[in-house]
Amino acid sequence: MKGIEVECVVVKDDVAVPDSTYSTGRRGIAGTIFVHKIAGAKANEGASLQEVKEAAEIANANIRSIGMSMTACTLPGLDKPGFTVADDEIEIGMGIHGEPGIQKLK
């Protein structure tokens, strides 16, 4: 649509992967929820687009997350998970799209 001003904030809260081989750097995981809520609340207050973006950037700079799983997921269209987790292990730092983590712990 023409005439609609937009801005973009790339959320990068995942502390497990500072330079992911699957992306251009830190990825957004659970922290995206808080950035969305803060930006939405600011917009609901009637803030300008620039003020909404600034609030989202401040939140993004201060939110950190790390993933943990006891099982791997199977992505749609695939027959098996991208990694496995034994019954006595947990996977730390995996991605939300099935990317393997950085460490397994017993």
Put a short name on every predicted segment.
Residues 17, 43-106:
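Mixed-charge interfacial surface used for oligomerization/domain docking
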Residues 1, 5-53, 58-65:
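Active-site histidine-anchored catalytic micro-motif
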